[in-house]
């Protein structure tokens, strides 16, 4: 039994050993697997050759074989490419392989052959190839007419950056062929007399219409031969590919497509995009370049794996994403948003969101004001929500915004839903910042009130007006109220010198602000304080002061923003109680402008008191103008200069003094004068008037009959005034100056004498030789009175008339007033008798005037009794009509006296002066038109005898006074 087992084992081992020995002999020999090429198909447009071959001697089921392929051009000995191709070959299987030529296949004949070698793990490595197959000729050439030039490839499509070889097949009658790429010349390689190759590397995209290649032969026709290269932009991979849902019914997939590769002439359409979902196996072509909508079915999965492929005629590009549907939720915007204001500071907001079962959204609420987010809050929402905004400003426009996103897996916020609203107005919350300016005019206070506009947060609405209540502290029950319409920021009041309290408040549609108080004392506007000079800093002033009292509750600093213009634009700054310095800055401050500051102290009673004045410049500048100068006291050796001052507020700096420049030919400077050289190299003398209050200077030690030039210019810490044109002055000579000193006083004396004589000539004439003396105006009468001689006064009873004259009154003439004041209107004859007749005695009689004459007593005493009356130019009744009653006596006296003066004094020694009583009737300036019945009567005036020594004097005095 044991022997049998051993025998079987030995037999098995011998059989295995025999099989291995047989296999070693077979595998050790090289396998002769010579390929056989069956067909070669060409695709000229792609410059591709597709080979098909088999291995006739292949008897195995499957082996991995390496094929070596050799390609020659134009002749078999001109090998242009050798390469290996490894593949698994099955029994009686046809092998396929594709080769792309670097030149168009139409340009040359190609030859292809193949050999093989087993490369399989079942066999030991082979050291030799099989035999070569027979050459397979690949010929796509076309015949070329003698006068034709063929260019290949024709209308080739390729990507930007590719390399391409252009083949020129030249007819036998053509030579010296030149080509251009667009307008640039290109050169090629001459393979033979009828074949040339032009290699273009890294071609660029020029335009969608393609790139032109044009060729022309020198000896040929004028025809141009060419082709077009359609260069496409490189197809890009889609970017930012993502998918999301807004309603769990559709998936919206978006991507960035990149550059469009469309070419003209339908050579290439725009790339198209395909979506493939691997779990469901669905494939859909998008109708858009950058988006696609994927429908979600009820039985769709929650996880998706998408591949997006972009494809054109030249290549494909793909990207993939995978996601869970609940993680890609992009909610729609909230809807039904409402806002209701609650008072002036609150607003209530409500909204709804799209609902899906128990799906929770997180909503973000924002409140914006003037484009800025002032409040933000998050709210969890299922279907609807609300929110209350508080601490809002009255009369302010707000914008409430809300958006939502998935609460569990945040992906994207929804679009904002916005709603604008405005809160209602409220009464102003702050009192006005008020200031005043007080001045005294004509015994009254002229008060100018100023206030600053409230900030928007303080006004709480549109300010409509300002209320002003003026309360007289002397009589509190008396108050006046004024209203100033907005947007005015001030007003003027005229008040007496009593103390007043002025209450000011701002009003809007909702109410009034707290009152601001201005207190005026009786001495407001009369404060006199010290004014000091300060130095400015950059863009402002550092102002400090000494406290006056210990009970100050604050200070106010005010100034004019435009001190050199009529518009002051008063500004002020409030300072706390324990602060005695502040920095005033303003963009309105300018160099070279003086600013005046006043510091006021506020008391507990709201009284303000001026404690200090300060003035200064942010930057002093040199004076821009020189003062006007006049010359005085010009002598041969000196003259005086006097210049004007100008307003300090218009100075560009603090005037420290004046420089006086003097030019002369001698160039010799007086003592205290400095010899200096100006920037224009001119040499002159300079004198420094270092007292700015001094406005005069006497220049001495000059030469007579010499020309001098001078200039007066002010200077500040920044420099002196402009170097303007000098004023010329010539000193007179000594003799002419002395002569002038003599002639001028004499001329002045003569001139004054002439004026005095002319002024007194009329007086001398009246005193020395009057035309008609007036005894009533003469001083002789006063002499007579002073003597009080009663015999010089003539009584009526002593007067015997020499002539009685009856004055007729024409019919219809005006009624005359007589001495008694009674009227007589009866007609009288044209020639009245000297005495009344009997016939007329019974009837009405005219009033009789009896003239009494003043006579010269000396003439009477001498015994000369002749009576020579002077001619009367005007009768009494004529004078009565032409002159008022109170003037009648003077008229008669003047005329009569004139007639006497004209008569020679030798012819008469007795001079009679008529003294006719003036009529008196009520109104002595007018005659009565309806007089009462006349009463007959006559009246004598007293007559007086004048001594002869006084007659002439009386006449002269009368003439002067008349």
Swiss-Prot record:
Glycans are attached at residues 219, 324, 492, 578, 723. Residues 29-738 are extracellular. CDD domains: FN3. One of its GO terms (cellular component) is oncostatin-M receptor complex. Keywords: Disulfide bond, Glycoprotein, Membrane, Receptor, Repeat, Signal, Transmembrane, Transmembrane helix. A motif (WSXWS motif) lies at residues 413-417. It is found in: Membrane. A motif (Box 1 motif) lies at residues 768-776. Belongs to the type I cytokine receptor family. Type 2 subfamily. Associates with IL31RA to form the IL31 receptor. Binds IL31 and activates STAT1, STAT3 and STAT5. Capable of transducing OSM-specific signaling events. The OSM/OSM-R system is pivotal in the differentiation of oval cells into hepatocytes, thereby promoting liver regeneration. This is Oncostatin-M-specific receptor subunit beta.
């Amino acid at each position: 039994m044991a022997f049998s087992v051993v025998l079987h084992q030995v037999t098995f081992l011998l059989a295995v050993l025999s099989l291995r020995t047989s296999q070693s002999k077979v595998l050790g020999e090289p396998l002769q697997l010579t390929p056989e090429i069956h067909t070669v198909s060409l695709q000229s447009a792609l410059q591709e050759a597709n080979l098909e071959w088999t291995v006739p001697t292949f008897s195995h089921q499957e082996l991995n074989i390496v094929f070596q392929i050799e390609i020659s051009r134009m002749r078999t000995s001109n090998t242009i490419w050798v390469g290996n191709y490894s593949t698994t070959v099955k029994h009686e299987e046809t092998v396929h392989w594709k080769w792309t030529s670097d030149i168009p296949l139409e340009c040359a004949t190609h030859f292809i052959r193949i050999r093989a070698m087993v490369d399989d793990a079942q066999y030991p490595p082979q050291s030799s190839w099989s035999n070569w197959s027979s050459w397979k000729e690949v010929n796509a050439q076309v015949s070329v007419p003698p006068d034709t030039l063929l260019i290949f490839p024709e209308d080739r499509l390729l990507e930007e950056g590719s390399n391409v070889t252009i083949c020129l097949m030249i007819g036998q009658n053509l030579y010296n062929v030149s080509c251009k790429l667009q307008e640039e010349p290109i050169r090629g390689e001459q393979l033979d007399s009828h074949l040339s190759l032009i290699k273009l590397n890294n071609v660029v995209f020029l335009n969608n219409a393609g790139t032109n290649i044009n060729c022309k032969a020198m000896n040929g026709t004028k025809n141009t031969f060419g082709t077009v290269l359609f260069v496409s932009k490189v197809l890009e991979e889609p970017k930012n590919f993502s998918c999301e849902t807004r309603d769990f019914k559709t998936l919206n997939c978006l991507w960035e497509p990149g550059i469009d590769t469309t070419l003209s002439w339908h050579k290439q359409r725009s790339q198209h995009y395909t979506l493939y979902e691997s779990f469901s196996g669905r494939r859909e072509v998008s109708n858009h370049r950058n988006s696609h909508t994927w429908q979600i079915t009820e039985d769709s999965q929650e996880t998706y794996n998408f591949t997006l492929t972009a494809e054109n005629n030249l290549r494909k590009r793909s990207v993939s994403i995978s996601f869970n549907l609940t993680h890609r939720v992009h909610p729609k915007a909230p809807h039904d948003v409402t806002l209701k204001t609650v008072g002036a500071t609150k607003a209530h907001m409500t909204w709804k969101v799209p609902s899906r079962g128990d799906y929770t959204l997180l909503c973000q609420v924002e409140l914006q004001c003037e484009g800025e987010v002032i409040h933000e809050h998050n709210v969890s929402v299922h279907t609807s929500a609300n929110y209350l905004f508080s601490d809002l400003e009255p009369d302010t426009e707000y914008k409430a915004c809300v958006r939502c996103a998935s609460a569990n897996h945040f992906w994207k916020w929804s679009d904002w839903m916005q709603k604008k609203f405005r809160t209602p107005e409220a009464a102003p919350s702050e009192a006005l910042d008020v200031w005043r300016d007080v001045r005294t005019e004509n015994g009254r206070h002229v008060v100018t009130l100023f206030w600053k506009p409230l900030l928007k947060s303080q006004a709480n609405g549109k300010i409509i007006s300002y209320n002003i209540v003026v309360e007289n502290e002397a009589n509190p029950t008396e108050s006046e109220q004024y209203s100033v319409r907005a947007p005015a920021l001030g007003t003027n009041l005229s008040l007496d010198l009593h103390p007043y309290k002025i209450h000011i408040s701002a009003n809007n549609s909702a109410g009034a602000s707290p009152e601001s108080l201005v207190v005026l004392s009786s001495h407001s506007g009369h404060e006199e304080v010290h004014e000091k000079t300060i130095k400015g800093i950059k863009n402002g002033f550092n102002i400090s002061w000494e406290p006056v009292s210990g009970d100050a509750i604050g200070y106010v600093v005010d100034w004019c923003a435009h001190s050199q213009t009529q518009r002051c634009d008063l500004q002020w700054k409030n300072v706390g109680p324990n602060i005695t310095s502040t920095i005033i800055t303003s963009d309105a401050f300018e160099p070279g402008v003086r600013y005046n500051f006043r510091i006021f102290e506020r008391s507990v009673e709201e009284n303000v008191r001026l404690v200090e004045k300060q003035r200064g410049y942010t930057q002093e500048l040199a004076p821009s103008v020189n003062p006007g100068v006049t010359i005085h006291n010009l002598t041969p050796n000196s003259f005086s200069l006097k210049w004007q001052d100008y307003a300090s507020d218009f100075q560009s700096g603090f005037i420290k003094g004046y420089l006086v420049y003097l030019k002369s030919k001698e160039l010799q400077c007086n003592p205290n004068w400095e010899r200096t050289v100006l920037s224009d190299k001119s040499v002159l003398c300079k004198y420094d008037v270092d007292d700015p209050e001094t406005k005069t200077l006497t220049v001495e030690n000059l030469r007579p009959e010499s020309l001098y030039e001078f200039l007066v210019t002010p200077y500040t810490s920044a420099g002196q005034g402009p170097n303007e044109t000098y004023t010329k002055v010539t000193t007179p000579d000594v003799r002419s100056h002395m002569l002038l000193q003599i002639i001028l006083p004499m001329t002045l004396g003569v001139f004054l004498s002439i004026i005095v004589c002319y002024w007194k000539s009329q007086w001398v004439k009246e005193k020395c030789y009057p035309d008609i003396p007036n005894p009533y105006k003469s001083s002789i009468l006063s002499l007579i009175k002073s003597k009080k001689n009663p015999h010089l006064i003539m009584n009526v009873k002593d007067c015997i008339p020499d002539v009685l004259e009856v004055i007729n009154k024409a019919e219809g003439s005006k009624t005359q007033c007589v001495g008694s004041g009674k009227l007589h209107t009866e007609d009288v004859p044209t020639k009245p008798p000297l005495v009344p007749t009997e016939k007329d005695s019974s009837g009405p009689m005219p009033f009789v005037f009896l003239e009494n004459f003043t006579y010269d007593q000396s003439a009477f005493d001498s015994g000369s009794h002749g009576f020579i009356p002077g001619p009367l130019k005007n009768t009494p009744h004529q004078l009565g009509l032409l002159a008022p009653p109170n003037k009648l006596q003077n008229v008669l006296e003047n005329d009569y006296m004139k007639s006497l003066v004209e008569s020679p004094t030798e012819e008469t020694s007795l001079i009679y002066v008529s003294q006719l009583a003036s009529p008196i009737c009520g109104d002595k300036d007018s005659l009565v038109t309806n007089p009462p019945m006349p009463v007959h009567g006559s009246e004598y005036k007293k007559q007086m005898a004048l001594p002869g020594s006084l007659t002439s004097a009386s006449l002269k005095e009368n003439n002067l006074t008349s």
